[in-house]
Amino acid sequence: MAAVSVIPNGDEFHLEGGAIAVLMVHGFTGSPASIRPWAEALHREGFTVRAPRLPGHAQTWEEMNKTRWSDWYAEVDRNFSELKKKYQRVFVAGFSMGGALSIRLASIRGQEIEGLMLVNPSIHDPRASMKLVPLLQHVIPSLGGRGTDVAAPNPPKHSYGRTPLRALRSLQKLWKVVQRDLYLVDVPLMVGYSVNDHVVDPKNSEMVIDNVSSIDIREVIFERSFHNVALDYDLDLLVEESVSFIKDVLSGAVNRDERDLIDAEFDAIVSGLSLDESAPTTYLDELDEIEAAEEYRGDNKPLPTLSSTQRAALVGVIGGPLYAVSVQFLKFDPLGLGAWPGAIALFAGIVTFFWQMRPDNDDDDGVAL
């Protein structure tokens, strides 16, 4: 039996409904609590909903550091198999990293999935600081988290306030696998993204839309919410679009493969109609053409990539040894103090990192990817 969640309402849940089931997957360092409002709304529409808690999540960052992406995916796959045995048709929905895991499932078991719903899917992060994770994971086990990226005030706690670096490194490996296999995804697809997401760049969604093989892709834009839409102002829009997508797939209004498209083209020709075969233009493309647009900023300020303390520590850890090497081998000693300044900077940087590892503040909340 899995350990009890330390996050309020963070345990997995199963809401019994009708013969149509939806498997819902939460994000990195998050918990089922982060998607519960979305899940409960789908249940009220008559669907059976299950949201597992991924291994290592909603406990402590130390426990999560013991898990890898293969553990998280295995839990998703296991729950999907259980739903397939009991329910007629099964949809999959993923938020953030849960989107990456859902894409992975669709690339392997796509023929068994009725449709895929993604909200701010996380499949890459080009920030320079992420390139340091492979090194930092061997030096420090975790970094302090950032505030929850929700525009609405007083969001519920749904994750812990630290980022476990070994788990984050494993997430980076998952991203590579998912990017490689995007072309294998051909299920009906709904992709929703926030234009003001401070955690996952909207270009992640653009990458998904541009590289999957799905014939029918429904694009949903959240303009009033930040990263976690299910806890934010656009929850109603998310639910409305999700229900509409599921019903359209069930009714056959959404095409799954090329045969359906060929049939639709034939019917259109017979009816004297024409189908637009031009490449779809996404909302992100349209944003590039807008010269001036007022963005909804919400109540939260944009979140920094690293705090000033973390940046100073990185300078010490990286710059200290470089200074010492320049003194020792290049005879470059601008301060005239030998290698000592470099050694002191390195020591101070390491001490600062360990200070960042102090116990969590239970009132703090980390950003769930």
Question: Where in this protein do the model-derived segments appear?
Answer:
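Active-site nucleophile loop of the alpha/beta-hydrolase fold
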Residues: 117-128
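Short beta-strand/loop motif that positions the catalytic acidic residue
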Residues: 184-185, 191-193, 197
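Catalytic histidine neighborhood in serine/cysteine hydrolases
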Residues: 50, 206-228
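Catalytic active-site module of serine/aspartate enzymes centered on a nucleophile-bearing elbow/loop
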Residues: 224-258
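Gly/Ala-rich beta-loop-alpha elbow adjacent to hydrolase catalytic centers
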Residues: 94-98, 102
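Short alpha-helix in the alpha/beta-hydrolase fold that links the catalytic acid
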Residues: 38, 187, 201-210, 221
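Intrinsic, low-complexity terminal and presequence regions
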Residues: 250-369
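Short, surface-exposed "cap/lid" segments of acyl-processing enzymes
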Residues: 3-60
